[in-house]
Amino acid sequence: MRGFQESPAGGPSAAIAELDPEERAVIARVVADVGLLLGGEPFGMEIDVADVDDDPLFRHFRGFESALTDPDDPAVLRILPNAAPDDRDVADEFRRFTEPELRSLKVDRLRTIWKALNEDGPEWIIPAADAMSTAAALTDIRLVLASRLDMETDDDAAALYAEIDRAHDTVTGRYLADNAQNPERVWLGMLYQALTWLQESLMSYVMRDDVMRDDVMRDDV
């Protein structure tokens, strides 16, 4: 995996990362499953419920379908927070009028990522005009993963990273689930780490003056 870097000079501005086929497949699958959580139509790589128990990495996603109508689900509240946390009636009314459009926007962003990850070749190419929306979608994915990992504070994140480090085999340089007390949590945490790193590299590209200017101009159109 290589983080996002600016495309070569001479062509349209874009952020380009490199992922191997397995990395692309894992990220695309999570993207699709978060889209399903938001009520989107199947992207094409969603969890086969019959196989979930045999897939340690995605066992944490069990119950996403039932969470669609449950605004109290922690993962849903992370990406679709209540507008009035202290007044359930007001919050529910606000959701009724605003949530469908917001869900649709988030699903569209996820679908754009999913399509890019299913292109041939190792490169994940994000045009400058799509960089901010892609970063926002990555935030949604990371929020869902953080919820499933019970990460609420910086201390929780530090504990997770320490757990991952303990599972690392320093001889081969590979993460070995057998070394962890909770292998599924370690694998999910590794995915969270990878997406965080990718998002940070994308934001480094976004924060360039010309990219920010192009994004503002597009929003003004």
Residue ranges and their predicted role:
Residues 1-108, 112-211, 218-221:
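Charged, alpha-helix-forming regions
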